[in-house]
Amino acid sequence: MRQVVLSPGQVFDEALLERTSAFDANALMTATQIVADVRERGDAALREYTQRFDGVDLQTFRVAPEAIEEALASCDPQVSTALQHAARQVRDFHVRQRQQSWFTVRDDGAIVGSKVEPIEAVGIYVPGGRALYPSSVLMNAIPAQVAGVKRIVCATPPTRDGSLDPAILEACRIAGVTEVYSIGGAQAIAALAYGTETIRPVSKITGPGNAYVAAAKKVVSGDVGIDMIAGPSEVCVVADESADPALVAIDLMAQAEHDPLASCYLVCFDEAYAADVLRAIDSHMQQSARAEITRASLDDKGLVVVCPNMDAAIQTVNVIAPEHLELHVAGGMDLLGQVRNAGAIFMGEWTPEAVGDYVAGPNHTLPTGGTARFSSPLSVEDFVKKSSVIQYTPLALANEGEAIMAIAEHEGLWAHAQSVRLRLGMLQDALKVDGAAAPVIDMDAQPADAQADEEVGRAELTDE
């Protein structure tokens, strides 16, 4: 791991991170070609790419219910039990994120509000390759299910024999996935976005993947929604003298073993302590089945930042804006308010990142590459959309008509202003008719679909 020692008053330079982007120009060009091909040729293109990249010739891509049942029978019971426990935790956390439709009635009878609706169909991508990720099924599908999404489609690459990991299929069952397809890579993203002869398109795609998956999500993002374009995973561990070097070392390795491009940052306060952590890494490495990947990550993307004090350490964290942040420090909760940029924050020595990856409940789909400066973890909100609701009364339009026309005319939009002017003229004409009563303004007016509460299911009517 490279090492940087900050002097008192020195500000950490983001350029020292040498971050890897989610994809490069070559990946984007390849993904663009694959997406266009699948969009044009559908299933035929999918078969060719599945043969080329996954080494298997599939005639159908949808996993049949009986095949899923067979796979479930071979799922390790201990893994199944663990996935069910994790699902309960994830669901309990995300239920608290549910949003409700709301309406408010102003003094002049105008009604404004926000109508919340689930997205109708979403696709979740679950990667294969170096590791299998049933946990990603839970983290993507459960928030969608909690949001009320009716059609949840999972795409995941097949193994060389054409099968899928039984644990992934078990996670799909637990999380309420309605369709499973044996397709991977950029071609899977294209199929989810645009559909084929046998796959209906979805409205939004979520889930991690390699550089080609990330690039494909970028390509289709103008036509369907995406969660984020995730780059290589990363962790930042802040450790003071109270932290056990062996625990800090294994937590860094837990991130490094994902991918040679994964980034691992140690922020500490003493060069001797940093040396202790590096020695502990060497000791742990002898037991790792993924030592080659782990070592490549730490050697190429690892960085130790030795800070003169805690203020400098927190400033460094906020510059890094890590996907995962571990605070192995005394009084960590007191520092929480100073941390502005982090995808997920793990507090104390008893909270390794692995608990967040699997069972704690908060989502493990997190912003990478410094995007925690402006992005958030995947949530129920990612699977709903909102419509603004507006209903004005004659009194409300009369009260605000002059303001509307003034702005519209300043912007040069004659018809905008005229649409209000005509209505105000009609209102004035009605009031001038001899013996005519003024328009009745119902101060208790509600939207035309007054049964919004029942139809939306979670609507609230509030009066401010």
Regions found by a protein language model. Give the residues of each.
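N-terminal Rossmann-like NAD(P)+-binding subdomain of aldehyde/semialdehyde dehydrogenases
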Residues: 1-120, 443
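Conserved small-residue-rich beta-alpha loop and adjacent elements
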Residues: 104-170
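Alpha-helix C-terminal capping segments
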Residues: 139-150, 173-175, 193-199, 217-219, ...
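Conserved NAD(P)+-binding/catalytic subdomain of aldehyde/semialdehyde dehydrogenases
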Residues: 176-247, 251-263
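C-terminal core of ALDH-fold dehydrogenases
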Residues: 319-435
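Long, low-complexity, intrinsically disordered segments
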Residues: 442-464
